[in-house]
Amino acid sequence: MVYPLKLKYFAKTALWGGQTLKNEWNKPCEYDKLAETWELTLRPDAVNTVLNGELAGKRLDEVIGNEKFPLLIKFIDAEDRLSVQVHPDDRFAAEVENDVGKTEMWYIADARDGAEIIYGIKDGVTELSCDARIEEQVKRVSVKKGDSFFIPSGMLHAIGKGCLIAEIQQNSDLTYRV
């Protein structure tokens, strides 16, 4: 039995979340600010449920029988800028967190005029100085609808105000805020 599965998403709220996913992308939820929808997830605290066909009502782990699914796919609605952050690589995550690392790919599904992301550190910065502000050392990149970015583990990054992003990432929720 092979057919396209429609999955129930997980809604996540945060102070920086917005209204676009709710109002323009028809993603209803109980939160005032909808920050993320996890469209494909097989995490211990979030497993999608099938909404259609013969498998309707079954959890995704029951359907594919794999609790270590490699990907997490989400939409992110940033009404405000997220904190500067970094994710661990697989080795560090396994040793310290007993999890996998987190590498991401962002597709800019929509962006307001002037939207930007933080994407690494400025050229010439070899070491983040504790004496200097992080904001002065990071690279800001203007974004527009249709842009895409690879965010390897270990790279400083942040989603800016006014960005709506489709994110494909390793199945990890490890984030270290800077």
What are the roles of these predicted feature ranges?
Residues L72, V138-V141, K145-D147:
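Gly/lys/ser-thr-rich phosphate-binding loops in alpha/beta enzymes
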Residues M1-G124:
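Transition-metal
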Residues H87-P88, A111, P152-G154, I168:
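Fold-independent oxyanion-binding glycine-rich loops
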Residues Y107, F149-F150, Y176:
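Aromatic side chains
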Residues A93, A158, D173:
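Conserved protein kinase catalytic core
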Residues I118-Q137, C163-V178:
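Double-stranded beta-helix
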Residues E36, L82, E104, D147, ...:
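Structural beta-strand/beta-sheet cores of well-ordered domains, especially the beta-sheet scaffolds
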Residues V143-K161, Q170:
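Conserved metal-binding segment of the jelly-roll/cupin
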